[in-house]
Amino acid sequence: SMQFFWKPGKGIQVCEIAARFFGYEHELTDMVYGFNIEELLLAGVYQKEKISEMFAGHDVFHPLHHGAVVYFHGKLRKIADQTKAYELAGNEAVAKPWIFYKTGEAVVEYGPNPYLALYYIGAESREKLDEITGYFFDEMSMTDPDGQEITYRNQIPDYFITEE
């Protein structure tokens, strides 16, 4: 896979090139289905006989629950307040929070911190998952020393079914 960044006047810059199967999403497969991709890859090298057993015990039509990874990007400013981001990290729906910056650090375009934060969230239904996602989109906040919002506002898109 390849990851790029684009900036007006600078064009496309390559950030990362890697032979990988998943980014952060492989952890979702484990969280939602109980199927560990890392274990599968290791079995492919060290215990080939285990692979059939792993697939036999797995049913893609019956997830343990619904899950998502909610990503947040930010403006290139110094972070002064992350209170809300840490409050969201403690939400009962969060299986794993990942806040990439520390207070006082400046958000950069690319590098070791690709996002402001991401949260692995889980729920018992798709509707509840959408509700939780909407709550995170509404509540997520990091501000700069002037109190200005750094977090780009995410929104759940509307999908319209058209009849032809």
Task: Describe the role of every protein-language-model region.
Residues 9, 64-69, 92-96, 113-118:
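Active-site lining segments that contact anionic ligands and/or coordinate catalytic metals
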Residues 9, 22-24, 124:
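Short coil/turn motifs at secondary-structure junctions
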Residues 1-2, 18-78:
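Active-site "cap" helix and flanking loop/linker of ATP-utilizing ligase/carboxylase catalytic domains
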Residues 56-60, 86-88, 105-110:
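Short proline/glycine-enriched turn/loop segments at secondary-structure junctions
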Residues 1-10:
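Internal nucleotide-binding/catalytic subdomain
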Residues 101-164:
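Generic C-terminus detector
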Residues 10-20:
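A short beta-strand motif that forms the metal-chelation/ATP-contact edge
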Residues 72-102:
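Glycine-rich active-site loop/lid that clamps phosphate-bearing ligands
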